[in-house]
Amino acid sequence: MIGTQSILPPGFGPGSHGEEDRLDYLPMPREMHTFERPSLPEPEQLDSHPIALALLERLQEALTAYRIGEQSRVIGLDRQPKADLKLLQQILGEGEVAIQVGGQRPVRIQETVLAGVWWVQLQVGLGEVVGQWLEVADIPALVRRRAFAEARWPRLGATLPDDLLNAGPVLVELLEAAKQHAEHASATPHVINLSLLPFSAEDQRFLAEQLGEGPVTVLSRGYGNCRIASTATPGIWRVQYFNSTDRLILDTLEVTAIPQAACAAQEDIDDSAERLREIREALE
């Protein structure tokens, strides 16, 4: 049995943020996550916060115009009044996907209830927010830029440990696929399903040591949970699926730019544009 805390990195998830200008991450779900309109403020509350309404209008324009594969649409929030941002957070709520990007300038990203609309926060120190914006995209551009910015190819020894079952062949296959991907990126991921292989604890340890840990961790919440983590090897991701009781049910490695489980589709974007129209109408 794998518990909730074992699949979340330190400082990521419920209880990791204060209230002021921070994103609040929801507890791990126990059942199917479906769209629920967030608790909206009364229209009269917005009368004194026209900036929040203006930001929603800009977001509507961005959602309507954006197409998957294009440059993401960014709406800066740094100079906006805190009261308006608080209302905006209330209106947009929290969606299925949360992302942490490590490094000297950590980044926390929370998808809103509108799939493909991301609230991005740059942080320093103990979580002080030094920059934030809304981004309309399949996944924020910063995630793509930093996932493998400092990745390196592992150096294999002449011999492998004697106690391995399948880690050696799996690693060779992964590295060959990753090098092909680096030369000629393919939209189709190369997937190895470890759940179907005899794979010992020694295999897991050896593979983890060789691939290393990357800076990006994604938690996607739907029916159960999906944890996606970049490795320190170019193009290789660990993608793990857990059921509603946190039991690991599928353990895979993917060679791809970004696993599709982390991304919004064009259908999601179009649906979010319609939902935002409904929300704005309810606020009139």
UniProtKB/Swiss-Prot annotation:
Where is the segment annotated Disordered?
A: 1-23
**Organism domain of life:** Bacteria
What family does the Swiss-Prot or TrEMBL record give for this protein?
A: Belongs to the HupH/HyaF family.
Q: What is this protein called?
A: Hydrogenase expression/formation protein HupQ
